[in-house]
Amino acid sequence: MSTTQQPHWSLQKSFAERVESSSHPLTSYLFRLMEVKQSNLCLSADVEHARELLALADKIGPSIVVLKTHYDLITGWDYHPHTGTGAKLAALARKHGFLIFEDRKFVDIGSTVQKQYTAGTARIVEWAHITNADIHAGEAMVSAMAQAAQKWRERIPYEVKTSVSVGTPVADQFADEEAEDQVDELRKIVPRENSTSKEKDTDGRKGSIVSITTVTQTYEPADSPRLAKTISEGDEAVFPGIEEAPLDRGLLILAQMSSKGCLMDGKYTWECVKAARKNKDFVMGYVAQQNLNGITKEDLAPGYEDGETSTEEEAQADNFIHMTPGCKLPPPGEEAPQGDGLGQQYNTPDNLVNIKGTDIAIVGRGIITASDPPAEAERYRRKAWKAYQDRRERLA
């Protein structure tokens, strides 16, 4: 979006209004989830042990819409596909209503990232709704990951769920001659001992009451979140107010970073934008420091010759979701911190959401190290949501 133009329409619309223009099912779901929970908060759960991760997700889950993980820094990560850490996180996501974002930052040739994403020990695609990629390896890796996700989705095994009911038929079930014939056949195959009657007819023969056995079979993906086999006792609850997340998988492109001295320049960011627009069925949006919807090459990299042209129509159609890390609130009455001394540059929710135009603020240590993490998560949720409301009011 050129600085001389009006703000992109996506900045003026509510999350609910943006659902209709979303090309990705998971993006549509996330927009609706944000409205239901009145939250645009992501927790960066950078803890060191699996027990801490699961406990934190359970405590903070009610306040967030996204949980960001780094599985490879977690001690004690259990890789079992049905009872391991990923499966338990998925159960908590269903219970509290949030999506899991594995901050893997894939960057390699296509065949390698496909295997890293869908195979290996972690099998990220199985439990993480969202992951991300650094596209220094080129746009082809994004297409490769999209193909891998689609193949995974198509080959999810289907499980047969069988229910058996036994009952005594009532009179109106046998209103016609055909039904009577069916009863005669059932009398031949239903064991007498299953009968509920011990009465005898006047001629000395046992009376016979037919029991009909009904077998119903339904088919459901074996990895469907609706199946309870992967969740622990007591975690069967599903967040009310919205259906469970779709099984589709999504990608965030790492377009910009907040670390001091970051080498991701305007040319790189423009290549990210092009890759996102070419892969809308898989790319949900960006991890970025500004809103990139409607952005043009001249906005990001004036004079850059990439041999391609971008149309205004393409730019206007953008409806990508944006997430931004480095969000930090000062203690009440104090000034906002500028950074952590290790290269991380902090921003308040108002600066990120209202001014810079991100959709979801990512918070880590600001919540994790607080004396009361759930209360602090609520403080961040309220601030980030107000920043979103202020943005809409400001740009109306």
From Swiss-Prot:
Listed pathway(s): Pyrimidine metabolism; UMP biosynthesis via de novo pathway; UMP from orotate: step 2/2
Gene3D superfamilies given in the database record: Aldolase class I
Presence of keyword Ribosomal protein: no
SMART domains (alphabetical): OMPdecase (SM00934)
EC number: 4.1.1.23
Any GO BP annotation: 'de novo' pyrimidine nucleobase biosynthetic process
GO molecular function, one term: orotidine-5'-phosphate decarboxylase activity
Entry-linked Pfam families: OMPdecase
Keywords: Decarboxylase, Lyase, Pyrimidine biosynthesis
Name of the protein in question: Orotidine 5'-phosphate decarboxylase
